[in-house]
């Protein structure tokens, strides 16, 4: 499931604009000189907004909805494949899972952040490929994938079940 909080949260990552006095100002509304001087075309991220809200929105709120919808149970998850952009978020992610009583022990986690870095939108595919190569899987095992998107506070959770050893 893909869950977005774009309708509730301010923009966190953007390009071609800036925020002035809590208003979003497009590059189209300024002169070329001002656009260049203010680096309006550079990608920007409100790190304070991100740090204060990413786990609450994309883990706690989103996963609680899915726990109710699909009757998910943490002890039925054999592996957890989270994407996070920085090691800074690992403990915060764990705390978020604990806050909603859905703790998945870290020995069940697999990520390749240390070896591959933040590979952005390709991350879950790269993680899955490495995971399938490294772990012998058994039919019926469940793999929960977590993919947040910080620009508009969206997240995707995928629950995969092993069939025929894959």
Predicted ranges, named:
Residues 1-53, 159-166:
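Condensing-enzyme catalytic core mediating Claisen C-C bond formation in acyl metabolism
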């Amino acid at each position: 499931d893909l869950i977005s909080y774009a309708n509730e949260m301010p923009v966190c990552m953007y390009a071609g604009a800036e925020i002035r006095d809590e208003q979003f100002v497009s590059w189209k509304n300024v002169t070329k000189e001002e656009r260049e001087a203010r680096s309006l075309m550079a990608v920007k991220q409100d790190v304070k907004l991100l740090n204060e809200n990413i786990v609450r929105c994309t883990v706690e709120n989103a996963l609680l909805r899915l726990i109710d919808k699909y009757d998910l149970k943490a002890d039925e998850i054999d592996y957890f494949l989270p994407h996070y952009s920085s090691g800074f978020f690992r403990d915060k992610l764990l705390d978020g899972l604990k806050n909603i009583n859905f703790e998945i022990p870290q020995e069940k986690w697999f990520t390749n952040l240390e070896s591959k870095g933040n590979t952005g939108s390709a991350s879950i595919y790269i993680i899955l490929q490495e995971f399938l190569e490294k772990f012998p899987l058994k039919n019926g095992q469940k793999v929960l994938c977590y993919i947040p998107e910080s620009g508009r506070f969206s997240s995707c959770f995928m629950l995969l079940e092993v069939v025929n050893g894959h």
